[in-house]
Amino acid sequence: MARILVVDDERDVATMLKFMLEKDGHVVETAYNGLEALGALGIEPADAGKPVPDLAILDVMMPELDGYGVCARMYEEPRTKLVPVLMLTAKGGMRGLHAAAPNVAAHVDKPFDPRALRELVGGMMGGRS
């Protein structure tokens, strides 16, 4: 079982991911913009008591703070620096930006194949479910 944070401003996408990943046995928390993600991670406001996820799935384009902004903040924080990030993007051209975000482990283009995403998450989590 892995702890996964899903962040997407499209609530139907976040809900579908939560349902799908929980079905695979993961514990999933959702947030709907970058600022909510920072709160869920215990970064802003600072809260060392918040559990650190094993994986963060972030949409690139979000209001308040985009996915790469969340990645940058995660990488600055010792507690979340090593959390792998899977980026969801509707714009394939955004993939090149991951060079500036060393914690981005993978990109998935929207719309995505749910089965392929589940397999990718399973592989990233070492088969933990």
Model regions: which residues?
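Charged docking surfaces used in two-component/phosphorelay signaling
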Residues: 15-23
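Acidic, metal-coordinating helix/loop segments flanking the phosphotransfer/catalytic sites
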Residues: 30-55
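His-Asp phosphorelay/catalytic-motif detector in bacterial-type signaling
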Residues: 51-54, 79-84
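Active-site residues of response regulator receiver
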Residues: 59, 89
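Receiver (REC) domain active-site loop signature in two-component systems and cognate sites
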Residues: 62
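C-terminal output helix
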Residues: 112-121
